[in-house]
Amino acid sequence: ATEHLRIGELDVLNITKPELWHERMEIPEVHNGYINRSTFYTIYPRPPYGVFLNTSKAPFNDLNVRRGFQHALNIQNIIDITFRGDYQRLNSYNSGFGKFTNPYIKARPYSPEQARAYFARAGYTIPCPDGILRKPDGTRLTAAITFPNSSPSLASTLGKLKEDARKCGLEIQLDPLDSTVAFRKIMEKRAQASFMAWGFTPPHPMNEQGFHSRYAYDERGGLITYTNNICAYADKEMDKLLDAETNAATEDELQKATWKVQQKIDDEALWVPCWTTEFIRLGYWRWVKWPNSATTQFCHPVVFDPMESYLYWVDNDIKKETMEAKREGKTFEEVDTVYDQYRYMDSIESLDNKDGGGKLPSVPVIPESGDPLEPSATEK
């Protein structure tokens, strides 16, 4: 696709992937100003890419294992190396919802020490000859991650996580399957853990289908399959929080309720947040024009991809000028623009407290460091 853009068969192309941005766009057409590049920060809900943990299956029926598992995955290393530092670590399950995203939640960092401390609480105290921890009864600390095999790069990425997890005493088994087979296994809740993401849309989080007990077990305690509660998670306190989120009558009520739901998801360590992008990067010929007004600069912020806004057009006069300049060897100034006016909309600093902090949910104070076994906000 980048070659089609380079020769002018495409007017515009999404080049968000690091290899496209850093390598494929280092071409004369960009350096000579014929093709422009732009980075646009959005406030669109982020897909919660991560590893979902099935609480109905060992070892993830133990909270300590789930928290240890979070500390055992070196996600930041993947971001720094595979994604060249361009992507960001996901924190809240509902990132990208503006004021409805709880900005106090921070993903648990990679830490062999903290991972082993949690695993020890779960009874995994004895190292095997290969370094994997086990219980006194011989049960090894092992877990399989199911994922679709349609992406070779994903298999390589998860393989790197597997290597670092061994330093924590955890054995990860990769379970790549055909996309249809993987989906069936996940929805039937036979997978121990699964790498995936749901697609979220504005205007606010709707977490009931993903975590309410009615989508996990029936009245007799039987596991309900083919629901979005792939963690098979059931908790009465969470049900109340989800009901409050669903039935909220005002934005303030919804904000308070959904922040508490997101905090509960984090406390219970139901998934391992992985990576996301806060921006979309585009390459486009200089004749493609975008809005530039007081109300809309480049693109409306609540759009996943500026190409889906349909607020852009071709300036035929500029196209004629560009093609003539290209034939004559004339160049223009290289253009690489960043539109970051909507960046950090999920941050603590972005919160509008002019009407009083009492309207915002109460949240726990998160220390910079401390006891890895410090109880969660919900435990306290």
Please annotate each region the language model reported:
Residues 47-49, 68-106, 113-114, 153-163, ...:
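Detector for C-terminal structural segments
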Residues 63, 109-144:
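Immediate post-signal peptide segment of exported/extracytoplasmic ligand-binding proteins
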Residues 1-57, 68, 76, 80-82, ...:
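Extracellular/periplasmic solute-recognition and catalytic clefts
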Residues 51-54, 103, 138-148:
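Short, hydrophobic beta-strand segments
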Residues 12, 140-149, 172-175:
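Short, well-ordered beta-strand elements
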Residues 12-15, 125-127, 166-181:
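Short, well-structured beta-strand/strand-turn elements
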Residues 60:
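Conserved binding/catalytic microenvironments
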Residues 1-9, 63-64, 159-168, 180-192:
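Short helices/loops that flank or line small-molecule/ion binding pockets
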